[in-house]
Amino acid sequence: NGFFISKNNKWKKTIVDEKYKGVKINKILKDCKKITYLKYKSKTPQSFNEIFENNYKSKDVVLTGQLYLPKKKGIYPVVYIQHGTGHPKGFVNAYHKIIEEMHKENIAVFIGDSYSGRKMKKSYWKLGLAARVYDGLSVLNTLSEHKNIDKNKIGITGYSYGGMVAFFTAYPKLLDLVSKDKQFAAYMPVYPGCDVVFKEPKIINKPMLMLHAEFDDYAPTIDCINYVKK
């Protein structure tokens, strides 16, 4: 039902996967109480042309992400985390640490999931960039309407392929077509690939921090440096 165990009456027989090492079970249970499962409707365009031409070849899909609020009441800014090629359930430990730190600052966290709603269980790389970006803009639409979220303080971050989502959702034309008058308040792409860009390099005038590793040879830094120079 999600990334965490929701019900298990045989705790003594439970074997915790190595990737969850360091996450204490009482903290997991505490976080489970804070989860709001949030549905958002998206599409699966095979290319950006489908978005630009408003001509989609696939049916709508309903995805479900996890919203972690610091408290059940109140209105909060939110950081939306978009996963990369790997399934988000594989990053529970890292997400838990981020959630914990964000909640100290009274900031909510939303974790997107582009795979489960599409019934994808392997070969995640087959989901293209256009579909992932559409998912990101759909999350923006949904979070903007949530009663506990400050619609003017929705930030986005992502890693690798998710970093490209955090980058491409800053393009004005895509925002206009999918999210109308809504925008993210801040962007933090982490080692995105900048080798795929639009001819018009202009992005919206919002803060963006792009993080890279100097010797990364998978998502080369130089591509993003050259893009910024444009």
Residue ranges and their predicted role:
Residues 3-5, 45-50, 89, 197:
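Short, solvent-exposed loop/turn elements at domain surfaces
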Residues 16-73:
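N-terminal cap/lid segment of alpha/beta-hydrolase-fold proteins
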Residues 56, 61-63, 78-143:
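Serine-hydrolase catalytic machinery in alpha/beta-hydrolase-like enzymes
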Residues 77, 185, 207:
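Alpha/beta-hydrolase fold active-site loops
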Residues 111-112, 158, 212:
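Hydrophobic residues in well-ordered beta-strands that form the structural core
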Residues 130-204, 217:
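Primarily recognizes the serine-hydrolase "nucleophile elbow" in alpha/beta-hydrolase
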Residues 204, 210-212:
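Short beta-strand/loop motif that positions the catalytic acidic residue
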Residues 220-229:
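Short alpha-helix in the alpha/beta-hydrolase fold that links the catalytic acid
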